[in-house]
UniProtKB/Swiss-Prot annotation:
Subunit structure: Forms a complex with KbaY.
Function (record text): Component of the tagatose-1,6-bisphosphate aldolase KbaYZ that is required for full activity and stability of the Y subunit. Could have a chaperone-like function for the proper and stable folding of KbaY. When expressed alone, KbaZ does not show any aldolase activity.
Pfam families, A to Z: GatZ_KbaZ-like
Top-level taxon: Bacteria
GO terms (BP aspect): carbohydrate metabolic process; D-tagatose 6-phosphate catabolic process; phosphoenolpyruvate-dependent sugar phosphotransferase system
GO CC annotations on file: plasma membrane
Similarity section: Belongs to the GatZ/KbaZ family. KbaZ subfamily.
Protein name, as recorded: D-tagatose-1,6-bisphosphate aldolase subunit KbaZ
Recorded metabolic or biological pathway in which this protein acts: Carbohydrate metabolism; D-tagatose 6-phosphate degradation; D-glyceraldehyde 3-phosphate and glycerone phosphate from D-tagatose 6-phosphate: step 2/2
Xref: InterPro entries: Aldolase_TIM (IPR013785), GatZ/KbaZ-like (IPR012062), GatZ_KbaZ_carbometab (IPR050303), TagBP_ald_KbaZ (IPR023435)
């Protein structure tokens, strides 16, 4: 995958560049990302997680082939070249099947890898760090690496069979806490130590050798570590460069490797830029994008309440709350406290568990009605100013249309812009 290989090469030569990965399956988030990349003539990395998309459909109901077709169709409709689009698979391994024995879970994981690679995903995060039903807790580096190497071999064989060659790139390692934001309130995080990072790398290098995969080591371009960034429901732990100084120095000894940082959502623009400069050159973002989507929709719902009688309105927020109460499985183990605290978390938490509910047919119907209601007539500018002030200035300058979809897209793109800016290359001093 030349875009990613070239990005790493440039970074290692001192360009201080990077790439961000859009981790979302929401159509409006993906449209915002594709349009932003098209405007800036930039490659776009879109990733699906093993929770979202798997051979059984995941929580989105999509297989890897479905997701690939969905993204390609969207890109085609927006005149974005497929050659500039990179699809990645995140946390691919036994994650979804930890309740099964290791043998059964890994059998599913092998099928998962085959389905991702055959569908055309080129960036593969091998993550076998989780313990299965009959495993010790925690797993040793050797067990994790041996399982990852088995999956890498499957990936290479699948790519050769489907495409006649393999240009896959791989990410190894994992972060703590779990993907998608911490479950509990956080105060401080332990940054991965250089020794732990080296141990992960060397265990994987040895396991890959055992599988006859030494030749693909240069295509292992990223190691997931914990740089000390995370968010919980109401707080963000900001990047502190001095705590990751030893990690930064350690990765400089590897010619083809950068770090991949997960849970970078809600970091400041300055922190994002510093992460990239410190060799966390792949930045993952997901909940912050659907959080921005939710912000825009709540703002538009407030505009609708001002403009329309209640009977004619979409009732989006009411519908959303009712569905979340009727189907609490995506939030009840994450949000704690009294009734009011949980209500606030359902709507406003940084972990954005509401993102799991947007595909629901009742909520989608309310969303479509909201957009229709506000698309018939121009939204009065004072209401845009009141509820979407960041977009208001662009509307006044003539750079943005005050239509519901455009306001939503632009609000999401405000977050994407921070990541784009953080990943821009500079001219190396020795160039």
């Amino acid at each position: 995958m030349k875009h990613l290989i070239e990005m790493v090469e440039s970074h290692k030569q001192g360009a201080e560049n990077g790439i961000y990965a859009v981790c979302s399956a929401h159509p409006l988030v993906l449209e915002a990302a594709i349009r932003f990349a098209r405007t800036h003539n930039a490659a776009l990395l879109i990733e699906a997680t093993s929770n979202q998309v798997d051979q059984f459909g995941g929580y989105t109901g999509m297989t890897p082939a479905d997701f690939c077709g969905f993204v390609h169709q969207l890109a085609d409709s927006l005149n974005f070249p497929r050659s500039m689009l990179i699809l990645g698979g995140d946390h691919l391994g036994p994650n979804r099947w930890q309740h099964l024995t290791a043998d059964d879970a890994m059998e599913n994981a092998q099928t998962l890898i085959k389905s991702y690679v055959a569908a055309g995903f080129k960036k593969i995060h091998l993550d076998c760090s989780m313990s299965c039903e009959d495993d010790p807790i925690p797993l040793t580096d050797e067990i994790v690496a041996t399982r990852a190497a088995r999956l890498a071999k499957i990936a290479e064989e699948t790519s050769d069979a489907c495409f006649g060659e393999s240009d896959l790139v791989y990410i190894i390692g994992t972060e703590v806490p779990v993907p998608g934001g911490a479950h509990e309130t956080l105060s401080e995080l332990v940054v991965t130590t250089p020794d732990a990072a080296r141990a992960t790398l060397e265990a994987h290098r040895h396991a890959f050798e055992q599988q006859g995969l030494s030749a693909i080591w240069p295509r292992i371009i990223g190691l997931v570590v914990q740089p000390g960034v995370e968010f919980d429901h109401t707080n963000v732990i900001d990047y502190q460069p001095e705590k990751a100084a030893a990690l930064r120095a350690m990765v400089e000894g590897y010619d083809t490797l950068v770090f991949e940082a997960h849970s970078t959502d809600y970091q400041t623009p300055q922190a994002l830029r510093q992460l990239v400069k410190d060799h966390f050159a792949i930045l993952k973002v997901g909940p912050a994008l659907t959080f921005a989507l939710r912000e825009a929709l709540f703002s538009l719902a407030a505009v609708e309440e001002e403009l329309l009688p209640m009977k004619a309105g979409s009732g989006l927020r009411h519908v959303l709350e009712n569905v979340m109460l009727d189907r609490p499985e995506y939030w009840q183990s994450h949000y704690h406290g009294d009734g009011n605290a949980r209500r606030l978390a359902r709507g406003y938490s940084y972990s954005d568990r509401v993102r799991y509910y947007w595909p629901d047919s009742q909520i989608d119907d309310a969303f479509e009605r909201l957009v229709r209601n506000l698309a018939d007539d121009p939204i009065p500018l004072p209401l845009v100013s009141q509820y979407l002030p960041l977009q208001y200035s662009k509307v006044r300058e003539g750079a943005l249309k005050a239509t519901p979809r455009e306001l939503i897209i632009d609000h999401i793109q405000d977050i994407l812009r921070q990541y784009h800016d953080a990943c821009q290359r500079v001219t190396p001093h020795n160039a």
